[in-house]
Each structure stands twice: as structure tokens, then as C-alpha cells.
Amino acid sequence: MTSPDGSTADAVVVDSLALSYGATRALDGVSFTVAAGSVTALLGPNGAGKTSTVEVCEGYRRPGSGSVRVWGLDPVRDAAALRPRVGVMLQSGGIYASSRALPVLRHLASFYARPLDVDDLAERLGLHQVRATYRRMSGGEKQRLALACALVGRPDLVFLDEPSAGMDPQARITSWEIVEQLRADGVTVVLTTHLLDEAERLADHVVVIDRGRVVAAGSPAQLTGDAEVLTFRATAGLDVAALAAELPPGALVMESPAGSYRVEALLGPEVLSAVSAWCTENGTSPHGISSGRRSLEDVFLELTGRDLRA
């Protein structure tokens, strides 16, 4: 993949990005790189700074400090050069209330040299039978139309802000299949999400953002590693440090919320035995025991001490 001037480049480079709204620091030194042809997910809870980051990358906001380059260009100064190659899906939609789906898509398609076939795109996203005006569309219909608007120009890079929010399960799966097809076609995708299954299924690279900072970055496999998770419920307020001391080296024990415990370790029968024995010695009994691979949510909880959906 090449930049607009013909040179090979990463699709997006964000370096020490900072942004404030009045006295509120929304972004504090955010840095990451998006490889051309990849799917990168910005993962974090609502209010983490994901949308602000994407809006700077799209050229809708100027950074307070730091820099952003899209195909090697400044997204604000070089907006005209980037516009034909970049698709944007906005949470707010940016569509007139009286507009209807197909006329909107046909109008947008007229601005591009090689647009996608509007009827095919509308059918794929279930918009071909939507007759309501934008103000009367359901939340899911608005999301599907916003996604179609981002894709109709056949972009080389597309920003998708919470692409499946408000969609029913079938529409969500369809949107995921479209993202997977975009990657297969060599299109670079940057999406924001707080949905773990969305990030784990779609992303080649995940950037975990919390309170305006990047707290981790890597492929889903790199972030989750080889550790497994044992969860159980017991009396609230147990000494998690004392329990961890009875487990194999490197084991991590957390309580969140009160009375719910997570043990991250390479699990084996000896770990379950040690947990059960320690609980018994401390006057409680573990129940609701389950185990599985460490997830991105486990990683987020470990890094921030709070649930991803908080």
C-alpha cells in the first residue's frame, strides 16, 4: 500500500498525541502505528478517549500537542488530498433528518471516481428496503447507513467509530464480515470499540486506551499471552496477596467486584487444590468455580483495576 505521493508508508502514525477540552485532559501522550492493510482496534470503556483519538486522525480536531500522520500527510492541512482515500463512519451519522438511505448513498457515490455499487452495498447491509427518513430510522438502521456512507467511496483507509453499536446480532455479524472482506481487499481499518468479541474477532492489532492513555498494545494473542483464568466466588475481603503466595510463582489474584475472585496463572490441578485448601483454612468455601483462557477483558482489568464496560 502506498501513500498519496506514491511512497510506501504506514497508514496512520500517532505520536505523543494530547488533547484537552477546557480543563479536562482527554488524551495524554497517545502513541501508536497502524500498518497498511491491517485492522487496528482502539479498545476501551466509554469516555476513554477512543473517539477523540479517531477525530484527530480524521482531521476533525487539531491536536493540542503531538502529531498525527495519515499516509504520511497531516489530516487537517492535507485534508483535500486525503479525502478521496479515507472513509469515515461517525457516531452521530452526519446525515440530514429528512434524508433517505438510497438517495444519500447515491449522492455520496457521485463524488468518487470508483464508488462501490450502491444497490449491492445497500442490499448487503439490509438498507435496500428501508424507506423511512433518517429521523425515523431505528438506531441499528442509522448505524448501517453510517457504515455504508463510510464505504461507498471505496476507501484505502476507513475509520469506524463503534461500528456495530445498536445493531441486532445478525446485522453485527454482517458488519464484521464486511470488515473482514475489507482487510482481504487490502483496505486499512481503524475501529473503536468496547466490545471484546468484536476486537478479538476482527483486530490484527489492539490498542487499549484508558483515561486518555495507551495502557497496552499488541495483537490479541500477545496481550492475552499463555495465562489462564480461574474465577470463583467466596467471602468478600479475602487476603488476595496471601492466597497468591500459596500459588505457583507469577500467579495473580484479584477481587473485583467484592466477593468475586480471579486467579491468573498457568492452571493445573494443583492450582485448584491450593485455592480450595487456602479458602478452607481461612473459613470460607469457593463456589461458582470456572476456568478458561485469559481474555482482553482480563488484561484490561489487570492493567486498570476496573471493568472494561465501566
Feature map (PLM): residue ranges:
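Helix-to-loop junction immediately C-terminal to a conserved catalytic motif
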Residues: E58
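Conserved ABC transporter NBD signature motif
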Residues: G66-D74, A81-L82
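Conserved ABC ATPase "signature" region
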Residues: R106, S110, L116-R131
